[in-house]
């Protein structure tokens, strides 16, 4: 009888942890989807998210005097935040903008175009003389490939990667899709 109660208590803790970790993971992904402009999908996800939240909270609220259950709930939250951020990283939704400043005027833009990237370039004046500024928009999931390519083609280039929350027109890479 005592063993059955211990197993039930351990199972309760596991359920609290998993429900909370799942809720926070889903919450994190939903917020990213919302920020990326996918309102309808984010709204649909929120329905299931709230069910998880109410369920996990209900398991703990009735027993707030049990510090182990409260700690398990908090641990589920922390793990859920980590898992949610990893899921979001793997989904890599959206686009990134690379702004590249190079001294290799006339060399880097054609090389990037040969790799299927859309590049807009212009001449600029820097502290140390003439530079070329390149602007490249890519899918976020292809961002690491673009970074590796830039490092390979011009290790001395100054590169800034920005989140491109919206774009219209232009040429988005064909090869790296």
UniProtKB/Swiss-Prot annotation:
It is found in: Cell membrane. Belongs to the UPF0316 family. InterPro entries: DUF2179, DUF5698, N-reg_PII/ATP_PRibTrfase_C, UPF0316. Gene3D superfamilies: 3.30.70.120. It is a multi-pass membrane protein. This is UPF0316 protein STH2077. HAMAP family: UPF0316. It comes from the Bacteria. The chain crosses the membrane at residues 9-29, 41-61. The keyword Plastid does not apply. The keyword Transmembrane helix applies. It comes from Symbiobacterium thermophilum (strain DSM 24528 / JCM 14929 / IAM 14863 / T). NCBIfam families: PRK04164.1-5 (NF003194). Keywords: Cell membrane, Membrane, Transmembrane, Transmembrane helix. GO terms for cellular component: plasma membrane. PANTHER family: UPF0316 PROTEIN YEBE (PTHR40060:SF1).
């Amino acid at each position: 009888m005592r063993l059955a109660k211990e197993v039930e208590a351990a199972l309760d803790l596991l359920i609290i942890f998993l429900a909370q970790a799942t809720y926070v993971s889903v919450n994190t992904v939903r917020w990213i989807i919302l920020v990326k402009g996918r309102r309808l999908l984010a709204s649909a996800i929120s329905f299931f998210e709230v069910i998880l939240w109410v369920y996990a909270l209900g398991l703990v609220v009735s027993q707030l005097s049990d510090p182990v259950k409260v700690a398990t709930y908090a641990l589920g939250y922390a793990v859920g935040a980590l898992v949610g951020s990893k899921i979001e990283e793997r989904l890599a939704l959206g686009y990134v903008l690379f702004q590249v400043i190079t001294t290799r005027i006339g060399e880097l833009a054609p090389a990037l175009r040969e790799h299927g990237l859309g590049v807009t370039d212009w001449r600029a004046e820097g502290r140390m003389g003439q530079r070329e500024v390149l602007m490249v928009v890519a899918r976020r999931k292809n961002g690491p490939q673009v970074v590796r390519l830039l490092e390979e083609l011009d290790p001395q280039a100054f590169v800034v990667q920005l989140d491109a929350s919206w774009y219209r027109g232009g040429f988005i890479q064909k090869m790296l899709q």
